[in-house]
Amino acid sequence: MLNVIATGLSLKARGKRRRQRWVDDGRVLALGESRRSSAISVADVVASLTRDVADFPVPGVEFKDLTPLFADRRGLAAVTEALADRASGADLVAGVDARGFLVAAAVATRLEVGVLAVRKGGKLPRPVLSEEYYREYGAATLEILAEGIEVAGRRVVIIDDVLATGGTIGATRRLLERGGANVAGAAVVVELAGLSGRAALAPLPVHSLSRL
């Protein structure tokens, strides 16, 4: 029994050393590189693995596709580590449908807390709490379960992939607060600074890994 426990601790320590070998204080180390040599920032990693798609999902909108970032093991790990640092102290992470689920689940696992799925309208069984909002290309609805998950009194951090106008995170905040949660802040991978989402969400603390 003692040997099993010791082995588990050893594996956990080795895993931590592997993460620290290339993620150090918000910097991402190249393979085989030491902390004494140069490193690139998480923001640079995000920018290098983000694909710009013109006129999607509607004409006139430039879509920030983070699929290559999430598919890259180093990129995903660096983003997870950085977002987890900004969400420290939360006892529940709220991930926004759909790409927010990817990072929210990873961050929740890193923090050893639960994750709440904030779904698009019509995806959850009733009863639900619903909130309509407007984004840069139309109206939408977000929902959370009204029963079965207790959020009242819990310190929640909202996690999403992109902050644009602030409509999505604002609606998520209202939903959580209607359920009695203490929304401590929001953390996103990419912030589109020109769309003033941060100002729209004030005074909610907002953390972004990259501002484009």
From Swiss-Prot:
Pathway: Purine metabolism; AMP biosynthesis via salvage pathway; AMP from adenine: step 1/1. InterPro entries: Ade_phspho_trans, PRibTrfase_dom, PRTase-like, UPRTase/APRTase. Catalyzes a salvage reaction resulting in the formation of AMP, that is energically less costly than de novo synthesis. GO terms for cellular component: cytoplasm. The keyword Cytoplasm applies. The gene is apt. This is Adenine phosphoribosyltransferase. GO terms for biological process: adenine salvage; AMP salvage; purine ribonucleoside salvage.
